[in-house]
Amino acid sequence: MLVSDFHFDLPDELIARYPTEERTASRLLHLNGETGHFEDKQFFDLLDQINEGDLLIFNNTRVIPARLYGRKASGGKLEVLVERVLDEHRCLAHVRASKAPKEGAELVLGEDKLGEGNGFKAIMTARHDALFELHFNEEQPVFDLLQQAGHMPLPPYIDRPDEDADQERYQTVYSKVLGAVAAPTAGLHFDNPTLEKLKAKGVNIAFVTLHVGAGTFQPVRVDNILDHKMHAEYAEVSQAVVDQILATKATGKRVIAVGTTSVRSIESAAQAAEKEGKLIAPFFSDTSIFLYPGKTFRIVDALVTNFHLPESTLIMLVSAFAGYRNTMKAYQHAVEAKYRFFSYGDAMFINKNPNALNDLP
């Protein structure tokens, strides 16, 4: 199975650089995975697709202002993107500079926001492959420093500096647990009135946590997808969520994941539980689950998701869920119908294809 099987041509003007004025003002492409039929709708029509007793699962991770600009103490400019906070004073980060900092190098960060001479210092203490371990000398915890001086880590394809409005719009309204460096973007379409309408309809709601890492934007650098090494991200699925899933399955209702990160959290928990002979069990661990055509989904029955990059692991996940041909046809239609793509773009609602295992490239 080749990465090129998941290619499609995307005109640059279809990449959404800004969100819609209202969260729910996006368009929605409904794809029936079983029949391959798709239909153009508006996002608020999603309420008609979700039934009483269904369980909607969201990812409640909160994006940290993870991008810092600064300089080496020796003077060279650099950019830091925090990937993971290790403790109150240490983090793992990507560092972009003309020359990679060496162990022991001192970095001065945050002066663009705090003023020249008011930046804070970090020492590069170790390197772990592409990531640098940074130790912050300040008394304040890393999260506090990022809140003061960090920029929202907009994805590279948005191709503009972050603005004040992104502080709100690049977060879901229910985000709670700090730790992501990218938003779980399917959730950006939901506002509080929509959540209240879902609850009033008798739809059940649950939250998992997966801290989305910068690896989600990394291209697949191999020809055969079986050679791809998936990045790891930390995920949590609590006992309470497991109980909700089991109760939903017992009544014949659907488990609906909001976003690929929710899918990966839930299916990671199911995959780990299978070794114990269980359908699903609590999960608190890193996951590098890679779902591509030929892989099965043990729990998730339907999916709300945005439109993803060509040749990305996320379009592979959607193809595994809806069927390869169904997915590529729906994407071709989305391009022709001028849907808006990627993080600030439009959404899809997909019913699982029970025959997806037979629909391979």
Curated annotation (Swiss-Prot):
- According to UniProt, the name of this protein is S-adenosylmethionine:tRNA ribosyltransferase-isomerase
Family of the protein in this entry: Belongs to the QueA family.
Look up keyword Aminoacyl-tRNA synthetase and say if it applies: no
Q: Name one GO biological process term.
A: tRNA wobble guanine modification
EC number of this enzyme:
2.4.99.17
GO CC field: cytoplasm
Going by the record, the broad EC class of this enzyme is transferase
SUPFAM superfamilies, from UniProt?
A: QueA-like
Q: Which domain of life is it from?
A: Bacteria
Gene name per UniProt: queA
